[in-house]
């Protein structure tokens, strides 16, 4: 008997194993079958299209001349579309692959955990008290919170059910617990494969036991996918089947997200045992906050389970949630009683409603139910009582176009001024001085408003500016103690002193930049509109040096700092701004040379003054102050002094730039001197009126004598000056070469920095877009960038 029973069990297990093998084979071949079906479906669809088109063409030929040709064609097209839809649906059904049970349950548990987290966040949002207990008075939707708790409970039960299904799936083909010893060992005669139920083991197809709770064994090739011998975990490391692995992963995620502490080898009955033991409909007892009263009086209006229960009016007849239903029943009963319809309720509420109807009929003064009765309110009368009838006249309405921040300030000032004037007139009319001051303040405010609401410009006194310039000449960045001391001495605000130093530094830097951009041969010029303190200070210091050099050549009535320049285009006498001449102090050799070359000063007629002024534009830009001179001989003398200063600067620049070509330059100067002498002789005749004045005649005689002296001593001075100039020129050239090398190195360093920044930006796609939109000088050059490599060699 026992042998027959064991044979029957073995036959049943073999049948189950065959069924499972067929399923596994179907899943393995499903992918290949799917691809083959897709290819065949594509071919069949093309063939079907061709057949349908041929049929349509043949039928259209036969029915071309019939009346119902169009209708037949439409009917045929609809039939073809329907057949295509049916075929596509069949193909979709056939192509559907059965999802593995372990993957399906794993997705299900992931969805349930996300849902639990969302509902728990809703509960936590209303559970906290907030900062200083402000959330205590928050309106709490109790129905929504109760629904969230029910959803969490349902999710927990769903997780329990998923683990139960995994245990059932893993129990198929498992070994009995009797066979397993207390230490977990199993005899080899009792081990069989859960898929094929065979006990045989081969070297390349060995039987492997699952270390989970399923108590199953598998051949290596019976698994899906088959397990290779190399991938078998060595030593004490465990191997798990797909169902046990899925169960372990689900329990681990539950413990991590929800905060539970279930062991990995726990049974499905141990998971959420308390929630499963609760009776149906008592989910609210799990909630710790169910006894809290609702802060909202109308919180019971919304019941999220109304749709599920089909309205739920019958369940809310008695209790707090049936307030609205009671009111509706009362209103309907009142309407029915007024129309003469009898109410047959038979309950206690029906008697109460009938009593209320009788009370309404007997006394009209008392309102028992229904909407609140409010008497009509005359809002115009209420407004007059609160603000008075004259409130509209006192208010001055303004249009939207007149509104603005300046207008608001203006109205405020006008109202303040008007109120102060009224109070002063009412109190006493004797204080006329106070009224005048108020009027003056109003005028000032109006003038400020007309100018755009700007503040009055503050100017420092002259003595303070001079003192600050002296300190700035010593140090451009004085310390805080020095600035505070200056502010105390000059009785100024320390902030204004700091601002003055900041502005002067800015102006000095700007002037240095403009001078560095210009050519070295050109004169250092500053526009007449720049009235910075640094520029004025430099010009004042340089005019003192020029005055010392020009004392011997200029007549006694001439002033180098104050001179008048008349434009040749305008005949009208106009006043120009005073301009200070700024030149570098010449050397002793150039001074002697210029004193002997006095013949370079030439009397120029009024018709050629425009040419002289065009040559001297660079000099006139540096001048900042000028006055109108009444006498014409002073005008000519000022022009001559400017010319000498310009020539001094030109000679000095040429001496610095070209020291080796000094002899050729001196010969050119000699020829220029001779030409100027001839011009001076030619120009003496048209200037009879001007030569009558003593100052000009003496100047011409001195120039003629100076020209004769220069011709004789020119050769001697040239030799002496050439030697000295060569020495100075060598020093200057060495310094210039060093400066040029430093400048070149600085430029290369800047280019290297720019290239590295661009390369760093080019690594990211955002940086490429920015480089495409940016405008820089490197974009105009070639796209190839040459990066120099610096190599440092040690001196041997």
From Swiss-Prot:
Residues 570-580 have a biased composition (Low complexity). Residues 605-735 are annotated as: 5 X 27 AA tandem repeats. Induction: By pathogen infection. Residues 81-90 have a biased composition (Basic residues). CDD domains: homeodomain, PHD_PRHA_like. It holds the Pfam family Homeodomain. GO terms for molecular function: DNA-binding transcription factor activity; sequence-specific DNA binding; zinc ion binding. PROSITE patterns: HOMEOBOX_2 (PS50071), ZF_PHD_1 (PS01359), ZF_PHD_2 (PS50016). Sequence repeats lie at residues 605-631, 632-658, 659-685, 686-712, 713-735. A zinc finger (PHD-type) spans 190-247. It is found in: Nucleus. One of its GO terms (cellular component) is nucleus. Its main location: nucleus. The keyword Iron-sulfur does not apply. Residues 738-759 are annotated as: Leucine-zipper. GO terms for biological process: defense response; positive regulation of DNA-templated transcription; response to auxin. Specifically binds to the fungal elicitor-responsive DNA element, 5'-CTAATTGTTTA-3', of the gene PR2 promoter. Belongs to the PHD-associated homeobox family. This is Pathogenesis-related homeodomain protein. It comes from Arabidopsis thaliana.
């Amino acid at each position: 008997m026992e042998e027959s029973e064991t044979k029957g069990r073995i036959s049943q297990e073999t049948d189950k194993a065959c069924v499972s093998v067929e399923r596994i084979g179907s899943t393995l071949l499903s992918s290949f079958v799917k691809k083959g079906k897709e290819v065949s479906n594509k071919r069949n669809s093309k063939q079907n299209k061709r057949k349908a088109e041929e049929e349509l063409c043949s039928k259209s030929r036969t029915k071309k001349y019939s009346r119902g040709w169009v209708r037949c064609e439409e009917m045929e097209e609809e039939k073809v579309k329907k057949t295509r839809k049916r075929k596509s649906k069949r193909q979709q059904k056939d192509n559907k692959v059965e999802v593995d049970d372990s993957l399906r349950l794993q997705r299900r548990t992931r969805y349930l955990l996300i849902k639990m987290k969302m509902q728990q966040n809703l509960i936590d949002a209303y559970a906290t008290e907030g900062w200083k207990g402000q959330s205590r008075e928050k309106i709490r939707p109790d129905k929504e919170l109760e629904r969230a708790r029910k959803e969490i409970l349902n999710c927990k039960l769903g997780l329990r059910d998923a683990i139960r299904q995994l245990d059932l799936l893993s129990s198929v083909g498992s070994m009995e617990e009797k066979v397993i010893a207390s230490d977990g060992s199993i005899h080899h005669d009792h081990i069989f494969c859960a898929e094929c139920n065979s006990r045989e083991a081969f070297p390349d197809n060995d039987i492997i036991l699952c270390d989970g709770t399923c108590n199953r064994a598998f051949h290596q090739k019976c698994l899906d996918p088959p397990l290779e011998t190399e991938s078998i975990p060595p030593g004490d490391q465990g191997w798990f089947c797909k169902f046990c692995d899925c169960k372990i992963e689900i329990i681990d995620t539950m413990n991590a997200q929800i905060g539970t502490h279930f062991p990995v080898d726990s049974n499905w009955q141990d998971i959420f045992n308390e929630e499963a033991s609760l009776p149906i409909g008592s989910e609210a007892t799990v909630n710790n906050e169910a006894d809290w009263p609702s802060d909202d009086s109308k919180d019971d209006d919304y019941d999220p389970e109304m749709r599920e229960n089909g309205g739920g009016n019958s369940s809310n007849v008695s209790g707090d949630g049936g307030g609205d239903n009671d009111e509706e029943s009362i209103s309907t009963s009142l309407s029915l009683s007024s129309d003469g319809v009898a109410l047959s309720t038979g309950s206690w509420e029906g008697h109460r409603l009938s009593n209320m109807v009788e009370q309404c009929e007997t006394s009209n003064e008392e309102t028992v139910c229904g909407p609140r009765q409010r008497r009509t309110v005359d809002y115009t009368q209420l407004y007059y009582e609160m603000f008075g009838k004259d409130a509209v006249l006192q208010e001055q309405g303004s249009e939207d176009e007149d509104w603005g921040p300046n207008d608001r300030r203006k109205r405020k000032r006008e109202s303040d001024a008007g109120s102060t004037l009224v109070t002063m007139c009412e109190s006493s009319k004797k204080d006329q001085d106070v009224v005048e001051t108020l009027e003056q303040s109003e005028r000032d405010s109006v003038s400020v408003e007309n100018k755009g609401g700007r503040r009055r410009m503050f100017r420092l006194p002259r003595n303070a500016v001079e003192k600050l310039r002296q300190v700035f000449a010593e140090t451009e960045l004085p310390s805080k103690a020095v600035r505070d001391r200056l502010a105390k001495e000059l009785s100024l605000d320390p902030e204004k002193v700091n601002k003055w130093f900041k502005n002067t530094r800015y102006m000095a830097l700007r002037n240095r930049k403009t001078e560095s951009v210009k050519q070295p041969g050109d004169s250092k010029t500053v526009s007449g509109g720049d009235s910075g303190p640094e520029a004025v200070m430099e010009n004042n210091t340089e005019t003192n040096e020029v005055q010392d050099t020009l004392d011997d050549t200029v007549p006694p009535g001439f002033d180098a700092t104050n001179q008048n320049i008349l434009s040749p285009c305008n005949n009208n006498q106009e006043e120009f701004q005073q301009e200070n001449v700024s030149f570098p102090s010449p050397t002793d050799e150039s001074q002697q040379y210029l004193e002997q070359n006095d013949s370079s000063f030439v009397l120029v007629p009024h018709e050629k003054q425009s040419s002289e002024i065009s040559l001297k534009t660079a000099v006139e830009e540096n001048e900042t102050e000028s006055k109108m001179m009444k006498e014409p001989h002073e005008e000519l003398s000022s022009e001559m002094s400017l010319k000498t200063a310009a020539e001094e600067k030109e000679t000095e620049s040429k001496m610095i730039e070209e020291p080796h070509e000094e002899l050729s330059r001196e010969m050119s100067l000699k020829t220029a001197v001779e030409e100027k002498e001839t011009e001076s002789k030619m120009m003496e005749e048209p200037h009879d009126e001007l030569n009558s004045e003593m100052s000009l005649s003496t100047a011409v005689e001195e120039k003629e004598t100076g020209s004769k002296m220069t011709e004789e001593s020119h050769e001697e001075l040239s030799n002496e000056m050439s030697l000295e100039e060569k020495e100075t020129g060598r020093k200057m050239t060495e310094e210039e070469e060093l400066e040029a090398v430093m400048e070149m190195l600085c430029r290369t360093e800047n280019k290297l920095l720019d290239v590295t920044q661009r390369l760093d930006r080019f690594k990211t796609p955002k940086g490429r877009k920015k480089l495409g939109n940016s405008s820089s000088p490197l974009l105009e050059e070639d796209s190839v960038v040459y990066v120099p490599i610096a190599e440092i060699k040690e001196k041997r």
